[in-house]
Swiss-Prot record:
Name the UniProt record assigns to this protein: Ribonuclease T
Organism: Pasteurella multocida (strain Pm70)
Chain sites annotated for binding Mg(2+) 2: 27, 29, 185, 190
Known EC number: 3.1.13.-
Source superkingdom: Bacteria
Subunit comment: Homodimer.
Binding site for Mg(2+) 1: 27
Length: 220
């Protein structure tokens, strides 16, 4: 086997695990459900890497409290739910432009280091998080968006398939990942737990022999 062939079959390389996609775990906290009109208030992201044993582990983190964009709708019920005080100066909130620029910069650098072709959002009920991230990217006009425009890995779906649980706290409990309900609905905390959950599911499938996939006749 040549060196090129060996690399092409090396499942310890992240670029070979998801067909060249680079997973980035995301969570957002918002002032409503409409990504076009409601404020994005908090954003966290965690990249992943393969360790020397070929197991997926969390890597780099970025986290921002975000100022509502001009004219944004603020739903009081949403603020009551996530506990965010948008007028608290200790939030250290930045503009959407700063947050999206720094996020894209971190992701592009990590994606390049992993030799992947495109990044893909991983989130719990991912369509929600993706819609707010993409809306913010469009509003700010930040260029070189590394994320696939519509593809995503939804850990609610994946954990439903693997554990029969779709709620984040229940899925974490099934995976024996500690979850503090008092810290839930912090974008950073939820991203950290979602990253652990995603890595656990990917690694557990590998331990069970489900990846790399082999057809029945290939095992003979």
């Amino acid at each position: 086997m040549t060196e090129i062939q060996a690399e092409a079959t090396n499942t310890h390389l992240l670029k070979h695990r998801f067909r060249g996609y680079f997973p980035v775990i995301i969570d957002v906290e918002t002032a409503g459900f409409n990504a076009k009109t409601d404020a994005l208030l908090e954003l966290a992201a965690i990249t992943v890497k393969m360790n020397e044993d070929g197991l997926l582990v969390p890597d780099q983190t970025c986290h921002f409290h975000i100022e509502p964009f001009a004219g944004a709708n603020i739903n009081p019920e949403s603020l009551q739910f996530n506990g965010i005080d948008i007028h608290n100066p200790l939030r250290g909130a930045v503009s959407e432009t700063v947050a999206i620029t720094e996020l894209f910069k971190m992701v592009r650098k990590a994606q390049k280091a992993a030799d992947c072709q495109r990044s893909i959002i991983v989130a719990h009920n991912a369509a929600f998080d993706q819609s707010f991230l993409m809306a913010a990217a469009e509003r700010t006009g930040v260029k070189r968006n590394p994320f696939h425009p519509f593809g995503m890995f939804d850990t609610a779906t994946l954990s439903g398939f693997m554990f029969g649980q779709t709620v984040l706290v229940k899925a974490c409990q099934a995976a024996q990942i500690a979850f503090d309900g008092k810290q839930a609905h912090s974008a950073l905390y939820d991203t950290e737990r979602t990253a652990e959950l995603f890595c656990y599911m990917v690694n557990h499938l590998k331990h069970l022999g489900g990846f790399p996939h082999q057809q029945a006749n290939e095992k003979k």
